[in-house]
Amino acid sequence: MKRLQRIWQKKSRIALGMMAGTSTDGVDVALTRISGRGLASSVHLLSFATYPFSAQMRNRILQLLSARTEEICEMNFIVGEILADCALKLLAHAGYKPEQIDFIGSHGQTIYHLSGAAGRRNSTLQIGEGAIIAARTGVITVCDFRPADIAAGGTGAPLVPYADFVLFRKKGKVRALLNLGGIANVTIVPGRLEEVIAFDTGPGNMVLDGLVALKFQGRKRCDVDGQIAARGKVDKNLLRDLMRHPYLKRQPPKSTGRETFGEGLVKSLWEQGNGMPFADLITTATYFTAAAVHRSFLKFIFPSFKVDEIFVSGGGRHNRTLMA
């Protein structure tokens, strides 16, 4: 506790953050200097890198959605070793030693996320054992962010609203921060912290990536730059069916994950698209992501906020067809 108190009392702290998202494509690692405390904090990025998962590791992680307990138990420690290695790699690249780091924040890799399911308790599970990271690096490691959010009465996602407010608030402006990851989420940053809202809008890249992986049997992971979608046409009947998904009707706060928009939906779309040009199927799925975001703004954001600016992040920002 004394060590934590000393860190809190410092005028600035060196922190390393790690995130593995629902796209399951790798680990983002950021080394930062945080000055000040609370809402008065400022963050300076010192170094950043993304370390991709190998195709074999990505497949092993994706299979955990329906794996045996022993496999999940083992992978918790395997992914912990991967995360520790990623942390040490970035420190070496940036010219820092572990003893110079005040703390590590590690999200881990989400395996299952239950939110708003009828008759089920909100719950979430991430792997990437924090004790492994702490032992390998010798640095205080903070984890279990999503379980902590649920314990405090949240849904476990999105996790970024407080940081979004600290980093992006601007007097006299209402900003929307849209993240197009595997799942798409949005944070609305008005003038006051108590007015902030955030929720998952629906699928981001997850459905698109799943369809591409099926089509190319794993040789491709995504529709690079939206090139496939740019060649196709929207199947209006299929899009209409997709937009009837019950998640899109739920009121925020809400969150979702691979359990809802993952393999099950991808296989269903694949079967429904049998006989349809693949480009049309991808175009329709791309429009599904865009339409879900659009509906979220119309139903849940614009009635309460006049948005001045929208910032887009996540892998989906590279998809030109989606961004169009």
Question: How does the language model describe each region?
Answer:
Residues 6, 11, 20, 25-26, ...:
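Catalytic phosphate/nucleotide-handling subdomain of diverse soluble enzymes
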Residues 84-95, 164-169, 271, 290-301:
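Generic structural signal for well-ordered alpha-helical scaffold segments
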Residues 65-128:
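Short beta-strand-loop/turn "lid" adjacent to the catalytic site in phosphate-handling enzymes
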Residues 1-10, 96, 111-131, 141-143, ...:
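Nucleotide/phosphate-binding catalytic cleft detector across ATP-hydrolyzing
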Residues 14-16, 174-178, 311:
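Conserved beta-strand elements of the Class I
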